[in-house]
Amino acid sequence: DKLQKFQNRAARIIAGLSYETNSADVLESLGWETLESRRQRMKSVFLYKIINDYTAPNLKQSLMGSNSMPSSYILRSTDTDIAFPKPRTEFLKKSFKYSGAKLWNSLSREAKEAQSISIFKQNIGR
């Protein structure tokens, strides 16, 4: 949150606008994303790479684990979601396995079934 405020202030200075100007408008005029949207986009790309075997196999095994369907089922069936357990703690909600699966499941089917990273990036925006 502090870092986002810093980015907003820097954007206003670069754009030569006053502090009263809406930060979302300033970021949009500069073509900047919020830090949160950038994090989500980068996490989505990383998940795509994990699921489609562009990373070390242990990452996919760790993400899919025993709480999930086999990857062959996920990628070849009509259901492209990652199964994940209901979190019992805040710690689990903040884990990459949980938040990543939740993010992946929120993506469009078109994005999840993209044939390349560049197509995936186009499908998730930006």
What are the roles of these predicted feature ranges?
Residues 1-126:
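Hydrophobic/basic alpha-helical segments
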